[in-house]
């Protein structure tokens, strides 16, 4: 038996951050390119760009900035903070659910 969950953050009923956006930002951090990140994730550039821009607009924060090399992208310090806090949130929820799972296993 397992308890399943998904976490995302909404503002005014619209997604601003979740596992998908987290994955996109981490791929950008590794690749320094939205195009390369999208390819790595099996997404179109347009889909990755759309999610990134939607999050930036809804948060009213820049998540990426242009690098020194042409067309390179880097995460902003705010993006890194958001990723860090999201990972902590995931870990906290995981710990709570792990305890709940143990309790439910006793009942079933």
Model-derived segments and spans:
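Short, Lys/Arg-enriched N-terminal segment that forms or immediately precedes the first helix
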Residues: 1-13
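Key DNA-contact positions within bacterial/archaeal DNA-binding proteins
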Residues: 46
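Residues within the DNA-recognition helix of helix-turn-helix
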Residues: 51
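Residue cluster at the C-terminal edge of the helix-turn-helix DNA-binding motif
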Residues: 57-62
